[in-house]
Each structure stands twice: as structure tokens, then as C-alpha cells.
Amino acid sequence: MPPVPRTGPGYTWHLLRKWWFVTSFFRFFLACFLGFAAPAWVGAAAPAPIFVLNSLDGTVSVIDPATWQEFKRIPTGKEPHHLYMTPDEKSVIVANALSDSLTFIDPRTAEIQRTVRDILDPYHLRFSPDMKWFVTAANRLNHVDIYRWDGKDMHLVKRIPTAKTPSHLWIDTKSTTVWSTMQDSDELVAIDLPTQTLKWRVKTGAMPADVFGTPDDKTVLVGLTGGEGVEVYDVTGKEGRLIKTLKTGKGAHSFRALGDGRHVLVSNRVANTISKIDYQKMEVVDRFPGPSGPDDMDISADGKFILLASRWAKKLTVIDMASRSVVRQINVGKSPHGVWTLDHAPRQ
């Protein structure tokens, strides 16, 4: 293994891991020889791994952020596209769209916990904030499924036919409404979660993909993969109303909030850029590089780095937001899509 550079984010993670080993030994010494538990600060946790879903390989690449090396590759099912953490934070669920299954993985050890089958075409997935509902979008089969979550298992309550190619989901903070984009019929639909009924549908621009709701539940943003920007909808009325279009770049696709309660990123897959949107002013305020078909993103816990799936290059790309530059690329599998780590910035 090549030596870890003595500068940059890799070296920082390296020092953190060394600190974890030293403090863990010290904690063990105190517990064994002094007969009492060490203070909580002594046992600082090691950095959690980074998970990258290789959609055309049917695997998950597991990256050690201390060395920026892939140390494990987990077989899942066919076409793992997206992943989501369980409400208790004990599992991250990988949705295998073409295998009709969910793979539960320990977010710290990267060990497979279990596989749940007969979940039809789980392309996208999401838990409601009240932790009672689990929702999937069937991209291939044209329906949205709503499951009741009991803390361990999901139970199908309603299968809702939608339109062509349900793509992404968002649930409001009150757990009352699910919004879903229809990629091939160019629509945004709203579903009432308590009654599992379709509330409204409106036409959008070309090939709507990811959807992001502002924290006040008044506005929804839709990325247009077939266009050059993001549509902004007022969702406070009886149906969604288009109020603005933000020009970001060709192939606007996936959102990730910065965690500061004000900004959200969107990847522009064709333009190979990432745009920063101020969702209070609804303006594009910054731009970052996004090489080789930028797709899903996560943000490091300190808010300094974008972790990006470069879809066409088979790489995880690390972007320093301060310098607006690519600082590292790690080889992964074919067509990387979802990317996630437990040590992330807040999602609003």
C-alpha cells in the first residue's frame, strides 16, 4: 500500500485513525487496571467507511477514508442504485432494483446483516421523518410502494400506479406528503401518506430526476436531466405551481443539501459540474467541478468535501469546496451511482 501523504485530507484521516488506536488502548488500560470506565471522550470512534454503489456490477465498494483505498467489495443484487439509513442508524439499506431485494449493511463494519426479498423494483427509497413509513419508487414497473415500518421489517400497505418511470422521492417534515418525479412522462406527483392516495400531478420539464424539499415544506426543487436546470415549485396550494427555473447546467440530476439550512448542491451530469443553490433566495451562488458524469453526492462531516460518484469514469471523486478543486479520485466498480457515509454533514 502506498504511503499516506503528509498533507491534505488523506493525512488528516490518517492522524484521526492513529488517535483512535491510541485512545482505545488507553481506555482499555484504565478499565482493566484502574477498575473504572474511562471518560466518554477517550473512546473516539474511528472514521466510518464510505459506500459507493456500483450499479452495473451489482456490488458496493467500501472505501477507508483514512487511506482512501477500497478495502472491500460487497456483492449485493442486480442494479444497486440508491441507499438509505434505517431510523435507528444501525443499518444502511442498499436497494437492488433488478433483483427486487434490499441488502442491510452495518454502516461502521461494512458487514452484511441480512437480505430482504420480494420488494418489487426498489429503484429509489426513503423513510418518513416520523419513522413510520418506508417508501420505494419502482422505476421499471411504474408504481410507488408504501410500506409500514415496525422498527425491523416493512409491510406493504399500498401499491400506487403512477406514470412512466418513477424516479426519485421526497417526504415532507410532517410525514404527510410524498413527492415523486416521473422521468419518462415528465411529471411531478404528490401522494398523501396517511391515506396512500394520489393528491395531484403536474407537468414538468424534460426527464425530471431528483427532488428536494425545503425545510419549511413550502417549496420543492426538481432536477431536469433532460434540460439545463432546476425547476422550483410552490407546493402550499391544492397542486404544485411552477414559480421559477434556475439555470444550473445540462443534465441537472441529483441533490445534496450542504447541512447549513440554506444551500443545496445539484449535480449536472452532462455539463460535468455541480451547482450550489441558495434555496432561501432561490439563486445559483457557486459552481464546482464534477468530472465524468456526476451523479449522487455526500458531504463530509466537517462540511469541507464533496464525495461524488463519477458515473462514467468508475471513480469516487473527492472535491475540496474551499479551493473548488478535485483533490482525489478512487477507482471503484462500473457505473457508480449512490454514495454515502455515516460520518456526513446534516441533510438540510
PLM regions: where:
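Predominantly soluble domains enriched in secretory-pathway, periplasmic, or organellar proteins
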Residues: G35, W41-Q348
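Tryptophan (W) side chains
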Residues: W13, W19-W20, W41
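Low-complexity, intrinsically disordered short segments enriched for Gly/Pro and polybasic residues
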Residues: P9-G10, C32
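Bacterial N-terminal signal peptides
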Residues: S24-A40
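Low-complexity, intrinsically disordered Ser/Thr/Pro- and acidic-rich segments
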Residues: T7-P9, R27
